Amino acid sequence: MTLCPHHWKIGGVSLNSKLWTAKILAEQPELIKQVHKNYFKAGADIILFETVPSLKEAKVEAEIAEEYGYDYWISFSCLSENIICEGIPIAECATTFAKGYPHLKMIGVNCTKPEYITGLIHKIKENCDIPIGVYPNSGEEYD
């Protein structure tokens, strides 16, 4: 990362965008891979992919971790007790990661309204047996 006068940049890309990873994932997926590889190379024992808004992003992150044999967890942000921010059902996300991801140590939900958590946990449990983690927000509304 390079410190710029009023914002951070990674690989020359401004982090001022609220969803910089999603934007860069679509435009420059190799940059996302390199950023996460650097975290592993720095010596992290486990990487926490948090507030993941899309299944596509989660798959890229999982691919990186699995390629290098690093343990990780993926935590989705959700719009309701059924869907992640992208509009895909959490059940589909859980099914996607149910098998074939040996280094995935937890699938979860964060930055999500507390009233949605119980339903999300049930849907994840119905579709995979990976340990579940949650840490809801305090209920505030964000842009």
Which residues fall in each region the model found?
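Domain-level signal for soluble alpha/beta catalytic cores
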Residues: 1-143
